[in-house]
Curated annotation (Swiss-Prot):
ValRS has two distinct active sites: one for aminoacylation and one for editing. The misactivated threonine is translocated from the active site to the editing site. ATP binds at K528. PROSITE patterns: AA_TRNA_LIGASE_I (PS00178). The gene is valS. A motif ('HIGH' region) lies at residues 49-59. SUPFAM superfamilies: Anticodon-binding domain of a subclass of class I aminoacyl-tRNA synthetases (SSF47323), Nucleotidylyl transferase (SSF52374), tRNA-binding arm (SSF46589), ValRS/IleRS/LeuRS editing domain (SSF50677). NCBIfam families: PRK05729.1, valS. As ValRS can inadvertently accommodate and process structurally similar amino acids such as threonine, to avoid such errors, it has a 'posttransfer' editing activity that hydrolyzes mischarged Thr-tRNA(Val) in a tRNA-dependent manner. Catalyzes the attachment of valine to tRNA(Val). Monomer. It is an enzyme of class 6 (ligase). InterPro entries: aa-tRNA-synth_I_CS (IPR001412), aa-tRNA-synth_Ia (IPR002300), Anticodon_Ia_Val (IPR033705), M/V/L/I-tRNA-synth_anticd-bd (IPR013155), Rossmann-like_a/b/a_fold (IPR014729), tRNA-bd_arm (IPR010978), tRNAsynth_Ia_anticodon-bd (IPR009080), Val-tRNA_synth_C_sf (IPR037118). Residues 809-879 form a coiled coil. This is Valine--tRNA ligase.
Length: 880
C-alpha cells in the first residue's frame, strides 16, 4: 500500500480517529474465536457487569486490562476467545425496576410476578444495548457471537444442574440461620450488598434480676428491642465474678420470662460487664452460641421490620419506634440504669438504604466445608490457581479456611427460581431439573437464587457445560486468566474456584490478575455521597479512549489502588499527540514508499543502528513484562522508547540524511522510519488500539488490520552494542552542551566554541566518526576533539563518559556582569540556608512541629545548599 500523509490531518483528533473504527474491526470479524483450529487456544471470560446502568471507571479499568492481554495474545498467534456477557444482578436490577414502577404509582404486586418479569426483561434489553455501546467506545475486542447472559436458557440449565447435584450430595439443605435481612425490600442480602456506616447510637446498660432474688447481673446492648427475644445470659466459664451463677436463671425484664445463665468461651471477660444477653434469632454469634447450648430461638420481628406477636404489647410497632418505647418502659421499671453514647458501625442495605437486621429465617444453604477443603487442597498442587500478586493467595486461603455455610435463597422475583417444589397436600419436598409430572399438585418455591450462585458457574456455564462435549467447553476451558478487583475475591473468585473443581474437576482459570480500586485524587473511594465519581464516557469524549486506556493500564502496579487524575489523562493525551506528530513527519518523508520497497539492508548510520538496537531491547522488555501483567512497567518502557529515543533523538537525527543529497541514505532512513514505526505501533496497539490502527493503516503494510498483525520479535542481527555505546556517548555529550547553554542563557541559535577533551584516542575517533551529529545538535563555531586539548581559562565544563566538555565563555557572555549576578544569587541562597538551619536547630520548633513540616524544611535545606554550591562552582569557573 502507498502512504499518503495528506490523509493524516495536522491535528490529532481522538474523536475522528476513533469514529467507525470499532465497526471496521467487527465487520472484519477480527475478534471472533475459532477460525483457525491449528492455533493454540487462549481464553478469558469478562466479569459480567450488572444490567443496572452505566459502566463506571472500575469497569473501564478491568476491561482495559483484559483487552490488553487478549489483543497481545491474538497478535502472538493464539486463537483468542474473549467472551462477553452480563449479569442479571438480582436485587440490584429488581430494585431499579421497582423504583421505576413507584414513579408510575405502581408496585410489583400490582403487576404480579409474570408481568413484573416482562418489565424487567425490557429493562435488561435497554441497558444491555447501552453497555455494548460503552464497550464499543472503549474499543474492547470481544467475541459478540458468544455473548452470554446469566439468565440465558443455557446458563439456567447449568444452574439447575448444579443445584440438583449439590442437593443430591447433601451439600444443599434448607434450614434456619441468621442472615442479613433488608426490611425494606424484604429479602436476604449477601455480605457484599451490606454497606457499613458509622452511626451515633448508644449502649443501654440494664440489670437482669436473678430469679432467686439474690441479686442481678448487668448487661449492655445497642439494640434493646431484641431483648424481647433473649433466651439466655452468657458469661465466661473462667470468670471468677460469675462462675457461681452458671446454671442459675434470671428474669427477663418486661417479658418476665425466666432464662438461664450459661458459660461459654465466646464471651470476652474484659469487655463491658463480662456478661452478654443472648438472642439466637437476631444475632449470628448468639445463634451459634444458642446451638451449642440448645437454646430456644424467639423471633420478635416481622419481615418488614415491625414487631410481631412475640414482642407482646409492642406488636405492630416499627423496630425503632419500639426501641424508644421499650427504653422508656425499662427506665420506669428501674432496670435501665445508664445510657452511654456510642459511635458504631451499622450495616445498611446497598439498594434500599435500610438498616440491615440480623434475622432468623428459613433459607436454602450450601454446605461449604467439603467444597472449601477441595479448593484449599488444589492450592497445594502444581495445577493451582496463580494469584497475581501472590500475596492475595493468603487472603483467599484465609477466607476458605474460615468458611461459613452460604445462604443462597433470595426473596425476589428476578433471578433463577429455585428448582424445588412442595406438594400442595402433603408438603413433601421435591428437587429436580424439571417440575414433577403431576405438576398441578405441586407448588414451586417462590424464592430465587443468590446472583453469586450463577456467577460462580460463569467460566464453564458460558462454554456450554453441562454438555461436556460442547466444542467451546472442550477447546477453551479452563480459561487462562481472570481479571478482577480484590474486593470480590471472596464473593466471586473463591466461589468460581470451588464450583469449577466440583463440577469440572479443574481450576476454572490458570491465573487471577488482581487490581485495586479506583479512587479520586485525594485517595478517597468514589461515591455518590461525595460526588467525586467520574463517568469514563465523559473522559473519552474529552480525551479519547486511547488516553483513558493508557492511563488506566499504566497508572499502578498489580493489586494496588489507582488514583484517577485528569492531569495524568491529559499527559497521556500529550503522549498520543506526540506519537501522531512523529508519525505524520515520518509519513511526509516516505515519498510514497510501498511495503515492497522497504529495505533495511543498506548502509546504516550510528543512529540507525542504535534505534534498531533500542527497538530490540524494548520488544524484549515489553513482552516479558506484559507476560507478567506488569503493565505499569510496560508503559514506562514504551514511553521512554517512543518519546525520548524515537521522537526526540532518532527523528531529529534522521533529518540529516532525509534533507541531504545521498539518495541511498535517504532510502535506508525511510525504511528504518517505517519499520520502527510499524513495530512500535504493534507494541503499543493493545494499549492504544484506535491510534495505532489509524497510523498503521497509513504505513506501508501487509494485512487487513494491526489487530491481527504479528507481535514484534527481537531480530538478533539488528542489535549493535558498539553503535548503542557510541549513541549513548553522543546523547550524553549533546545534553551536557545544552545544559551549559541553558545555565549561561545562551540560545541554540547562537554559535559557541566547543572543545571535547577525550581520555583515549579511541573515544576521540568514535566522536570524530559522528562529528556531523555533534555539529547538528550543538551548533559550534569551532569544534575540536582530541586527547591533547589544553585547559581554557574562564570556561564552563562538564564531564561525560570518557571525555570533558569545555565551552569557553569569552565573547559569549559579559563575564563581570555574570559574576556580579551570580554573587547576588549566592548571597540570597546563603541567607536561605542560614534561615532554614536556624529553624531546624531550634529545639522548640523540632518538638512542636508536625513530622511532615520538619521533613519539608529538611528538603528545603538540601535544595538551597545544592543550588548555592552550584552557583559557587559556576563563579569559580568564570573567575578562571
Amino acid at each position: 500500500m502507498e502512504t499518503n500523509e495528506q490523509t493524516m490531518p495536522t491535528k490529532y483528533d481522538p474523536a475522528a480517529v476513533e469514529k467507525d473504527r470499532y465497526d471496521f474491526w467487527l465487520k472484519g470479524k477480527f475478534f471472533e474465536a475459532g477460525s483457525d483450529q491449528t492455533k493454540e487456544p487462549y481464553s478469558v471470560v469478562i466479569p459480567p457487569p450488572n444490567v443496572t446502568g452505566r459502566l463506571h471507571l472500575g469497569h473501564a479499568w478491568d476491561t482495559t486490562l483484559q483487552d490488553i492481554v487478549t489483543r497481545m495474545k491474538r497478535m502472538q498467534g493464539y486463537d483468542v476467545l474473549w467472551l462477553p456477557g452480563m449479569d442479571h444482578a438480582g436485587i440490584a436490577t429488581q430494585a431499579k425496576v421497582e423504583a421505576k414502577l413507584r414513579e408510575e404509582g405502581k408496585s410489583r404486586y400490582d403487576l404480579g410476578r409474570e408481568k413484573f418479569l416482562e418489565e424487567t426483561w425490557k429493562w435488561k434489553e435497554e441497558y444491555a444495548d447501552f453497555i455494548r455501546s460503552q464497550w464499543a467506545k472503549l474499543g474492547l475486542g470481544l467475541d459478540y457471537s458468544r455473548e452470554r447472559f446469566t439468565l440465558d436458557e443455557g446458563l439456567s440449565k447449568a444452574v439447575r444442574e448444579v443445584f440438583v447435584k449439590l442437593y443430591e450430595k447433601g451439600l444443599i439443605y434448607r434450614g434456619e440461620y441468621i442472615i442479613n435481612w433488608d426490611p425494606a425490600t424484604k429479602t436476604a442480602l449477601s455480605d457484599i450488598e451490606v454497606i457499613y456506616k458509622d452511626v451515633q447510637g448508644a449502649f443501654y446498660h440494664m440489670s437482669y434480676p436473678l430469679a432467686d432474688g439474690s441479686g442481678s447481673i448487668e448487661i449492655a446492648t445497642t439494640r434493646p428491642e431484641t431483648m424481647l427475644g433473649d433466651t439466655a445470659v452468657a458469661v465466661h466459664p473462667e470468670d471468677e465474678r460469675y462462675k457461681h451463677l452458671i446454671g442459675k436463671t434470671v428474669i427477663l425484664p418486661i417479658v418476665n420470662r425466666e432464662i438461664p445463665i450459661v458459660g461459654d468461651d465466646y464471651v470476652d471477660m474484659e469487655f463491658g460487664s463480662g456478661a452478654v444477653k443472648i438472642t439466637p434469632a437476631h444475632d449470628p454469634n448468639d445463634f451459634e452460641l444458642g446451638n451449642r447450648h440448645n437454646l430456644e430461638r424467639i423471633l420478635v420481628m416481622n419481615e418488614d421490620g415491625t414487631m410481631n406477636e412475640n414482642a407482646l404489647q409492642y406488636q405492630g410497632m416499627d423496630r425503632f419506634e419500639c426501641r424508644k418505647k421499650l427504653v422508656k418502659d425499662l427506665q420506669e421499671a428501674g432496670v435501665l440504669f445508664k445510657i452511654e453514647d456510642h459511635m458504631h458501625s451499622v450495616g445498611h442495605s446497598e439498594r434500599s438504604g435500610a438498616v440491615v437486621e440480623p434475622y432468623l429465617s428459613t433459607q436454602w444453604f450450601v454446605r461449604m466445608q467439603p467444597l472449601a477443603d477441595a479448593a484449599i487442597e488444589l492450592q497445594k498442587k502444581e495445577e493451582k490457581v496463580n494469584f497475581v500478586p501472590d500475596r492475595f493467595e493468603k487472603t483467599y486461603l484465609h477466607w476458605m479456611e474460615n468458611i461459613r455455610d452460604w445462604c443462597i435463597s433470595r426473596q425476589l422475583w428476578w433471578g433463577h427460581r429455585i428448582p424445588a417444589w412442595y406438594h400442595k397436600e402433603t408438603g413433601e419436598l421435591y428437587v429436580g431439573l424439571e417440575a414433577p409430572e403431576d405438576s398441578e399438585n405441586w407448588e414451586q418455591d417462590t424464592d430465587v437464587l443468590d446472583t453469586w450462585f450463577s456467577s460462580a458457574l460463569w467460566p464453564f456455564s458460558t462454554m456450554g457445560w453441562p454438555d461436556v462435549t460442547a466444542e467451546d467447553f472442550k477447546r477453551y476451558y479452563p480459561t487462562d486468566v481472570l481479571v478482577t478487583g480484590y474486593d470480590i475475591i471472596f464473593f466471586w473468585v473463591s466461589r468460581m474456584i470451588f464450583q469449577g473443581i466440583e463440577f469440572t474437576g479443574e481450576r476454572p482459570f490458570k491465573d487471577v490478575l488482581i487490581h485495586g480500586l479506583i479512587r479520586d485524587e485525594q485517595g478517597r473511594k468514589m461515591s455518590k455521597s461525595l460526588g467525586n465519581g467520574v463517568d469514563p464516557m465523559d473522559v473519552i469524549d474529552k480525551y479519547g479512549a486511547d488516553s483513558l486506556r493508557y492511563f488506566l493500564a499504566t497508572g499502578s502496579s498489580p493489586g494496588q489502588d489507582l488514583r484517577f487524575s485528569y492531569e495524568k489523562v491529559e499527559s497521556t493525551w500529550n503522549f498520543a499527540n506526540k506519537i501522531w506528530n512523529a508519525s505524520r513527519f515520518a509519513l511526509m518523508n516516505m515519498d510514497g514508499m510501498t511495503y515492497d520497497e522497504l529495505d533495511l539492508s543498506g548502509e546504516k548510520s550510528v543512529a540507525d543502528k542504535w534505534i534498531l538496537t533500542r527497538l530490540n531491547e524494548t520488544i524484549e522488555h515489553v513482552t516479558q513484562l506484559a507476560d507478567r501483567y506488569e503493565f505499569g512497567e510496560v508503559g514506562r518502557h514504551l514511553y521512554n522508547f517512543i518519546w525520548d529515543d524515537f521522537c526526540d533523538w532518532y527523528i531529529e537525527m534522521a533529518k540529516l540524511p532525509l534533507y541531504g543529497e545521498d539518495e541511498a541514505a535517504k532510502k535506508t532512513t525511510r525504511s528504518i522510519l517505517a519499520y520502527v514505526l510499524d513495530q512500535t505501533m504493534r507494541l503499543l496497539h493493545p494499549f492504544m488500539p484506535f491510534l495505532t490502527e489509524e497510523i498503521w493503516q497509513h504505513l506501508p503494510h501487509q494485512g487487513e488490520s494491526i489487530t491481527v498483525s504479528q507481535w514484534p520479535a527481537v531480530v538478533p542481527e539488528h542489535t549493535d552494542t558498539e553503535a548503542a555505546a557510541d549513541m549513548k556517548l553522543l546523547v550524553e555529550l549533546i545534553r551536557s552542551v545544552r545544559n551549559i547553554r541553558s545555565e549561561v542563557n545562551t540560545p541554540m541559535s547562537k554559535q559557541v566554541e566547543l572543545y571535547i577533551k577525550t581520555s583515549t584516542d579511541e573515544i576521540a575517533s568514535r566522536l570524530e566518526a559522528n562529528r556531523s551529529y555533534v555539529e547538528r545538535f550543538t551548533n559550534p563555531s569551532v569544534l575540536k576533539i582530541g586527547t591533547d586539548i589544553e585547559a581554557v581559562d574562564k570556561a564552563m565544563t562538564a564531564v561525560v563518559s570518557g571525555a570533558e566538555v569545555i565551552l569557553p565563555l569569552e565573547g559569549l557572555i559579559n563575564i563581570d556582569e555574570e559574576i556580579a549576578r551570580l554573587q547576588k544569587e549566592f548571597d540570597k541562597l546563603t541567607k536561605e540556608v542560614e534561615r532554614v538551619q536556624k529553624k531546624l536547630g531550634n529545639e522548640g520548633f523540632m518538638k512542636k512541629a508536625p513530622a511532615h513540616v520538619i521533613d519539608e524544611e529538611r528538603e528545603k535545606e538540601k535544595d538551597y545548599v545544592a543550588k548555592r554550591d552550584a552557583v559557587q562552582k559556576r563563579m569559580a569557573e568564570l573567575k578562571g
